[in-house]
Amino acid sequence: MKEAVIVSAARTPIGRAFRGAFNNLQSPSMSSHAITAAVARAGVDPAEIDDCIMGAAMQQGTQTMNLGRQAAMASGLPVSVSGMTVDRQCSSGLMAISIGANNITNDGSSVVIAGGCESISLIQNEHFNAHRVADPLAMKHAPLIHMPMLDTAETVASRYNISREAQDEYSVISQARTSAAQEASVYADEIVPVTAIKLVTNRETGEVTEEEVTLAKDEGNRPGTNIEGLSGLKAVRDGGTITGGNASQLSDGAAAVVLMDGTLASQRNLEPLGVYRGMAVAGCEPDEMGIGPVFAIPKLLKRNGLTIDDIGLWELNEAFAVQVIYCRDKLGIPMDRLNVNGGSISIGHPFGMSGARMVMHALMEGKRRGEKYVVITMCVGGGMGAAGLFEVL
């Protein structure tokens, strides 16, 4: 049976949306930094690449007209390299890798690029096109399908009695883990430094100027975050529990991996990071989309004959602390195996990128720790969960 292995991976640092380093960097260009580095690390001839599959959650503006193809061209790949773009919201990057792997195992591809990108700065702004976004028939059958993500998190908190204190405590741990990981250069093997032209707005005059910046690490971590500071933050909704401190950050970034037929990788004496073993998705009520992983993970494990205890590392996207807590406790995931170097609360969450970032990090960290299996999982906007299984090599 054919296997699809990941032979290389690379990503940009994650920039803060709107005021961060990548607030003026278009998505094909941003993606090209990750793609070019991943291809170079794999040592493949670009002409061998069959397809470039990129995930993006908001496909308009700089991410419209097929980001996958645009990114391939921005990377200087031959015109023979095709491209496609995937939207499964926050699992788009993971979905792209799954599709790429299946192209190898089932359709005969030898080498595929897969990953994801999101520029919140250039899309989620005053130019965002929300014209006729709500379809009346979809709303008839699922009235809450467009419920704001923050409100779905508040629903999970109230419905399942998860306190503000518990959410803040989890967020402190996430920030501390990322801070320690950055101090130890844990993310260095993933990241490619990126130089970009940043827009800087003078708060007093409104004047916008350009500044060349080079970003070499994720911008979002807040070292020294403590429970006293988080507990003092005002909830976004009156009487609510979700704050800017216990929710994921709005971010910009891109990630890419090179997938290869396992036999070909062996013939070339490559040392893959891991092998794709499968993916599962599941739907849930849109108003509690954050708990989606509790439906997707059992599917994934059952299909592969595994249990929770068989998984050495878990990466769960941390859209909100409340949904991580619920999923962790409902499934019995040990905290010492979950988001061991932090997650979207402390690193950032470029929607289309996150799944691909989590895959590469889980495989690299799993290799460092000598683990066999890792699971990447996330809640998905609209009321879904997704989970992917990889074996560390």
Label each region the model flagged.
Residues 54, 151-154, 190, 197-200, ...:
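Active-site pocket-lining segment
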Residues 27-43, 67-71, 96, 149-156, ...:
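Short, well-ordered amphipathic alpha-helical segments that serve as non-catalytic structural scaffolds
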Residues 22-112, 117-134, 191-215, 288, ...:
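Conserved beta-ketoacyl condensing-enzyme motif
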Residues 87-118, 157-186, 256-263, 328, ...:
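Active-site-proximal alpha-helical scaffold in enzymes
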Residues 1-27, 225-291, 295, 302, ...:
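Condensing-enzyme catalytic core mediating Claisen C-C bond formation in acyl metabolism
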Residues 11, 24-25, 33, 169-267, ...:
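N-terminal extracellular/periplasmic Venus flytrap/periplasmic-binding protein-like
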Residues 37-50, 156, 160-161, 265-269, ...:
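Phosphate/pyrophosphate-binding loops at sites that engage ATP/ADP/AMP, CoA/4′-phosphopantetheine
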Residues 56-110, 131, 143-151, 224-249, ...:
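Conserved catalytic cysteine-centered active-site region
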